[in-house]
Each structure stands twice: as structure tokens, then as C-alpha cells.
């Protein structure tokens, strides 16, 4: 059997997340259905993680095993021809037998995007959170500095985020290597998070809490204490899904 790895970009607007579900349109489900047509048998696609409904990706990775003789280029061309335009296969590679897209990953990079102008262009409304009023960037940068390093992120963890068979004794402890807020276009900013792993909705919960500080509703001290509490109820709201993008997975 061959072990094939896909590099995938997708627009998650019209999908119920990555993971295959009964009676729901998902990224994994769409790709597996096309792989079945190409190989004339059921194929299980294993992703590097699970994105929620409405979340986008520039660099999701996933692998599957197959005995088909199709080349990597053949797979890429065929899948892109068969898949909806919202899902693109950027690269196809044959990997070692023991490669696993999820368990071999050493880290991930997520971006959360904001549009800060008065009127958001229609083509950006599905991919950026509109923050029309000015926000305190200095206070938000201080919050970002607080989460860099190794911490218990229970306060920013939603229920069901951990696979109990794969915790490795870490629980809700994760290491954030980089966390910053920066401009990338006119009136366009993003939070950038790079870490060894992320809990369910962790990025969106962190962003939602930091925006509470940026909007003047809470203080930097409140954010720092929320992290220490290890209690989801101590932190702020979950930021909307459409601003979040999985940028890349590290190996």
C-alpha cells in the first residue's frame, strides 16, 4: 500500500467543518467521495486536525493509503477536476509508510483576520471579522505576550477538544511559540499564532477574549487572570469562525 499526503486549501463558508458527518457537507467527506471514485473502493482520509464550520485553510494536510497506480500528479489533476471550486489540492506527495498527517505534526500556524475600515468590501465579509470601531492595539499586544510560552489553556478550551487516547499526559497544556497582531493590507490586520498544538476553538476563544480588552470592555489584568483560572467561564466569548484560517502545519 502507498501512503499519499495531500496539501489542501479550502473555503469553509458552506461546509460543516473538516470532519465527515452524516447528513452534513464537510471537507473530508467531499474529498473521500472523490477518492472512492478514483480507486473504486472506500478510502479513509486522515487530516492533521479538525476545523469547525466556517473556518478556512491555506495549508491543511491529510493522508490516505491506497494500492492504486495513479501518480501523484494524476491524483492532483483528477481531484481538482472533480472537487468543488471551494476545495483545491495544492500538492500531492508519496510519504513513508509510517507517516501520519496528525500524529507526525510538530506544530500549526493559525491566522485570525480583521477588517478595520468603515465599510467592509463584500468579497471580504466571509473571511474577515469587521471591527469598525478603533481598538487598543497596545493592550492587545500585551495580552499576546502573556500567552507566549507553555501554559494550561483550559480557560480557552471548548468541550470535546482533546482526544483522550492521544493527550500524551499534556492535558490542556500547550506551547505558543509566536503570537502577534499585525497589518497585512490597508485596513486589514491579523492575529498570528504558532504553537505545538491547539485545543478546540482555542484560537477563537483567545481572540474573542483579547478583543474584549481591545474594545475596552476588559483589562489586560483580567485577561492574565482568566488564563490563570483554568476555567472557560473566566474568559471571553468565542470569536466568529469566518475570520479564522489554518495557515500551515509543521512537520
Curated annotation (Swiss-Prot):
Formation of pseudouridine at positions 38, 39 and 40 in the anticodon stem and loop of transfer RNAs. The active site is at 52 (nucleophile). Substrate binds at residue 110. Transmembrane segments: none annotated. Its EC number is 5.4.99.12. The gene is truA1. Keywords: Isomerase, tRNA processing. It comes from the Bacteria. One of its GO terms (molecular function) is tRNA pseudouridine(38-40) synthase activity. Belongs to the tRNA pseudouridine synthase TruA family. GO terms for biological process: tRNA pseudouridine synthesis. Signal peptide: none annotated. Homodimer. It holds the Pfam family PseudoU_synth_1. This is tRNA pseudouridine synthase A 1. InterPro entries: PsdUridine_synth_cat_dom_sf, PsdUridine_synth_TruA, PsdUridine_synth_TruA_a/b_dom, PsdUridine_synth_TruA_C, TruA/RsuA/RluB/E/F_N. The keyword Isomerase applies. It catalyses: uridine(38/39/40) in tRNA = pseudouridine(38/39/40) in tRNA. It is an enzyme of class 5 (isomerase).
Amino acid at each position: 500500500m502507498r501512503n499519499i499526503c495531500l496539501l489542501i486549501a479550502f473555503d469553509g463558508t458552506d461546509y460543516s467543518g473538516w470532519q465527515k458527518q452524516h447528513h452534513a457537507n464537510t471537507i473530508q467527506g467531499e474529498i473521500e467521495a472523490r477518492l472512492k471514485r478514483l480507486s473504486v473502493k472506500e478510502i479513509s482520509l486522515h487530516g492533521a486536525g479538525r476545523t469547525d464550520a466556517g473556518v478556512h485553510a491555506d495549508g491543511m494536510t491529510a493522508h490516505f493509503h491506497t494500492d492504486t497506480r495513479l501518480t501523484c500528479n494524476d491524483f492532483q489533476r483528477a481531484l481538482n477536476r472533480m472537487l468543488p471550486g471551494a476545495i483545491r489540492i495544492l500538492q500531492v506527495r508519496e510519504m513513508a509508510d509510517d507517516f501520519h498527517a496528525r500524529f507526525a505534526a510538530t506544530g500549526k500556524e493559525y491566522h485570525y483576520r480583521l477588517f478595520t475600515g468603515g465599510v467592509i468590501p463584500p468579497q471580504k465579509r466571509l473571511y474577515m471579522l469587521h471591527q469598525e470601531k478603533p481598538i487598543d492595539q497596545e493592550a492587545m499586544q500585551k495580552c499576546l505576550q502573556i500567552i507566549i510560552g507553555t501554559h494550561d489553556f483550559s480557560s480557552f478550551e471548548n468541550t470535546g477538544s482533546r482526544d483522550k487516547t492521544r493527550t500524551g499526559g499534556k492535558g490542556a497544556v500547550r506551547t505558543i511559540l509566536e503570537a502577534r497582531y499585525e497589518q497585512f493590507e490597508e485596513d486589514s490586520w491579523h492575529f498570528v499564532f504558532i504553537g505545538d498544538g491547539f485545543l478546540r476553538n482555542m484560537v477563537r476563544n483567545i481572540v474573542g477574549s483579547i478583543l474584549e480588552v481591545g474594545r475596552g470592555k476588559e483589562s489586560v489584568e483580567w485577561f492574565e487572570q482568566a488564563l490563570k483560572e483554568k476555567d472557560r467561564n473566566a474568559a471571553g466569548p468565542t470569536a466568529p469562525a469566518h475570520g479564522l484560517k489554518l495557515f500551515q502545519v509543521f512537520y
